[in-house]
């Protein structure tokens, strides 16, 4: 979805934060931002959004570094309207990504980490234990992937989607290699992008969405409150 300039500028004024945030302060999570655009009450469970996407996106939002989290803002208009009956397709997409992309990548990262030579014995033990925790979690996630394969059990698929999001977030946070963390966050954002693409192009109401955000900041100005800025 192409963002028009007015909506893009309105989104720039929003600060994405952990938790549901405070709409009146211009600080929201990606899902409460979706609710704001849709004209819904302040919530991180907007009725207009795919529950599967929500389950995957929230652990990403809450675990990303602040600057990386801001990359999720353009997804809010794309998530709006994804409550479209296409979550079975999204579940299969996520299942394939888990088995073909995520778990192989984590396995490779684990082996590389174990092969490194660290300077201290305690550091070696800590790193090895951390990677083994990820290995066990990855093996458990492969079992959870069965839930994603069965689109008739969407409650389990939604729970598994949340687990995939948490696994990616944990791997990105625990790696000691900043470049590997960036690659994992890129993988997570790419998966969100692909899930939003399911269902094709949805009708855009960018002017109405921009207006709702502008009203948030106009209200702040009227009360003499500073507008939210994104921290460097």
Question: Model-flagged regions — what are they?
Answer:
Residues 1-18:
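Short, Gly/Pro- and small/polar-rich lid/capping loops
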Residues 13-16, 30, 192:
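Generic preference for hydrophobic/aromatic residues in regular secondary structure cores
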Residues 20-24, 132-134:
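A short, ordered amphipathic alpha-helix with a cationic face
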Residues 23-36:
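Active-site nucleophilic cysteine motif
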Residues 39-232:
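Structured binding/interaction patches within domain cores
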């Amino acid at each position: 979805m192409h963002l028009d300039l007015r909506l893009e500028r309105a989104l720039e004024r929003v600060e994405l934060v952990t938790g549901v945030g405070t709409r009146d302060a211009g600080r929201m999570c990606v899902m409460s931002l979706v609710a704001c655009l849709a004209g819904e009450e302040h919530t991180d469970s907007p009725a207009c959004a795919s529950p599967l996407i929500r389950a995957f996106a929230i652990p990403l939002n809450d675990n990303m570094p602040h600057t990386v989290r801001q990359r999720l803002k353009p997804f809010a208009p794309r998530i709006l309207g994804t409550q479209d009956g296409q979550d079975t397709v999204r579940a299969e997409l996520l299942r394939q990504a888990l088995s073909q992309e995520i778990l192989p990548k984590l396995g490779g990262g684990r082996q590389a980490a174990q092969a490194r030579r660290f300077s201290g014995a305690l550091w070696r033990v800590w790193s090895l234990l951390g990677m083994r925790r990820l290995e066990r979690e990855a093996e458990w996630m492969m079992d959870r992937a069965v839930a994603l394969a069965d689109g008739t059990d969407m409650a389990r698929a939604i729970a598994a989607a949340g687990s995939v999001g948490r696994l990616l977030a944990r791997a990105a946070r625990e790696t000691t290699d900043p470049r590997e963390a960036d690659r994992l966050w890129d993988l997570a954002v790419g998966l969100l992008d692909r899930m939003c693409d399911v269902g094709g192009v949805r009708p855009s109401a960018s002017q109405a969405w921009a207006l709702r955000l502008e009203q948030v900041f106009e209200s702040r100005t009227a009360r003499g409150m500073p507008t939210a800025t994104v921290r460097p």
